[in-house]
Amino acid sequence: MSGSTGERSFADIITSIRYWVIHSITIPSLFIAGWLFVSTGLAYDVFGSPRPNEYFTESRQGIPLITDRFDSLEQLDEFSRSF
């Protein structure tokens, strides 16, 4: 049988009032912060991904697909020039 590490048991933690006071504030706060991060568009700016209306522009309607493995760098340069 192993010795005690002196830590509180999981059942003791989740049945304490202090646990629920702390987590009843932090869990909804994290949810609201995440929702605001995405809904304001800040997530698109931080990670550099295009917004849903920016995937296809008027000048670029095709899918950037590389078709020739030996000319892939030239095709990538061509795709990047269209941005």
Swiss-Prot record:
Q: Keywords, A to Z?
A: Chloroplast, Electron transport, Heme, Iron, Membrane, Metal-binding, Photosynthesis, Photosystem II, Plastid, Thylakoid, Transmembrane, Transmembrane helix, Transport
Q: SUPFAM superfamilies from the xrefs? A: Cytochrome b559 subunits (SSF161045)
Localization, per the record, is: Plastid, Chloroplast thylakoid membrane
Does the entry feature the keyword Thylakoid, yes or no? yes
What does the entry list as the binding residues for heme? 23
TM helices/strands, residue ranges:
21-35
Q: Which Gene3D superfamilies match?
A: Photosystem II cytochrome b559, alpha subunit
Q: Name one GO cellular component term.
A: chloroplast thylakoid membrane
Q: Which InterPro entries match?
A: PSII_cyt_b559_asu (IPR006217), PSII_cyt_b559_asu_sf (IPR037025), PSII_cyt_b559_CS (IPR006216), PSII_cyt_b559_N (IPR013081), PSII_cytb559_asu_lum (IPR013082)
Q: Which family does it belong to?
A: Belongs to the PsbE/PsbF family.
The protein's job, in short, is: This b-type cytochrome is tightly associated with the reaction center of photosystem II (PSII). PSII is a light-driven water:plastoquinone oxidoreductase that uses light energy to abstract electrons from H(2)O, generating O(2) and a proton gradient subsequently used for ATP formation. It consists of a core antenna complex that captures photons, and an electron transfer chain that converts photonic excitation into a charge separation.
Subunit relationships: Heterodimer of an alpha subunit and a beta subunit. PSII is composed of 1 copy each of membrane proteins PsbA, PsbB, PsbC, PsbD, PsbE, PsbF, PsbH, PsbI, PsbJ, PsbK, PsbL, PsbM, PsbT, PsbX, PsbY, PsbZ, Psb30/Ycf12, at least 3 peripheral proteins of the oxygen-evolving complex and a large number of cofactors. It forms dimeric complexes.
- What is the protein name stated in its UniProt record? Cytochrome b559 subunit alpha
What is the scientific name of the source organism?
A: Triticum aestivum
